[in-house]
Amino acid sequence: MTNVALTGLARDLARRAEEGRPVRIGVIGSGEMGTDLVTQGMLMKGVEICAISTRRPHTARAAIRIAYGDEAMAREADTASGLTAAIEAGRIGITSNELLVTNPLIDVVIDATGKPGVAADFDLMAMEHGKHVVMMNVEADVTIGPYLKHQADRLGVIYSVGAGDEPSSCMELIEFASALGYTIVSAGKGKNNPLDHDAVPDDYVEEATRRNMNPRMLVEFVDGSKTMVEMCAIANATGLVPDVPGMHGPNAGRDDLAKVLIPRADGGVLSRKGVVDYTIGKGVAPGVFVVVEATHPRIIERMDDLHVGKGPYYAFHRPYHLTSLEVPLTAARIMLTGRPDMVPLPRPVAEVCAVAKRDLKPGETFDAIGETCYRSWTMRAEESRAARAVPVGLLEGGKVLQAVRKGEAVAREIGLD
């Protein structure tokens, strides 16, 4: 306890806790993200992680053990009544996706899977049963996000990308700068891991073990796939676009963002204003940024006086994102204010496509993002359509129809079956 008075969201959540009306959250997925959610939820007043769905109950038990120190809170439930009883008893039900998304006691479902197919099936089912959906599954958002948002509107519930990941953290800066009337020149993230387009899980087992990560998930970051997905999510929520296929990804440090990610006419690398991009320069990761332009002499004068920069371009930088740890705040805001943190526009302006990591033969089965077949590659929607590129979120489990050479984009004629 401290002498700090609760204000705003913390105050409102504490009131719900006192009234016995916590925001009840069900989590689909019990991996690293699910474990973070259970742990963070335990620390929050007015928020209750009350159910986890998984095909591997032992991983949900491990998540609960990490959060609480033992498994006393865990209750496995294979019936609807059993799950309801577990929640009413103040325990965390370990159950199936279907039982979780249809349970009447759950207010918000968080998709923590990273699998687009899960979103297509169970996130929609959750909304059909009156649940709000918070998406940590950014791969699904860039594949079917506009559809899920449309269905949420139709069903009278809320669909939102979760707080804490780079897209929603960057959105905070974009909204801040836009509300102040600045022109958004570029927005994006610093890349956390060294970029290796050829990365495969077998090469990263040791590092993944050391970092308590799934090797496939680590490779999704290393080969650039995650960055492509995240920047596409920002594009499709704002209308900002990739300047070139795959974006520039310059080596621009924090102090150089407003010199590099600006139009070429002013010494930068961009052909236009209003783009998403990422940087591998020092001091930006694990944060996000927005580069803006001011034109009024008074604003430029004050920015100089405030040591923001000489102008007319300025970089605003959020030096952190807390990933899974921030996501319960989205669920709380939905329940308390009825507002999402981030939603896709009705029509996407960018697509995440796939580029072969190795030569692929006809008849091979496409594996998952972060494995050995392909990496993600973001381009403008019209470029994707012209190339007949397959959205990366649709590839897993499909068949290679024609030979694909390493470095080639996967087109509709090549896969799926």
Q: Model features per residue range: what roles?
A:
Residues I64-R65, G145-L148, M171-F176, K189, ...:
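Short acidic, glycine/serine/threonine-rich loops at helix termini
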Residues M1-D123:
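N-terminal glycine-/serine-/threonine-rich beta1-alpha1-beta2 phosphate-ribose binding loop
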Residues H58-T59, A140-G145, K149, E166-C170, ...:
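Short gly/pro/ser/thr-enriched loop/turn and capping motifs at secondary-structure boundaries
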Residues A152-G156, S160-K226:
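Rossmann-like NAD(P)H-binding beta-loop-alpha module
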Residues N3-A14, E206-E207, R211-D417:
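C-terminal catalytic/substrate-binding lobe primarily of soluble NAD(P)-dependent oxidoreductases
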Residues T113, G117-H129, M136-I158, G162-G164:
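Rossmann-fold NAD(P)-binding glycine/threonine-rich loop
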Residues S30, R55, G114-K115, K131, ...:
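Short, ordered loop/turn segments at secondary-structure junctions
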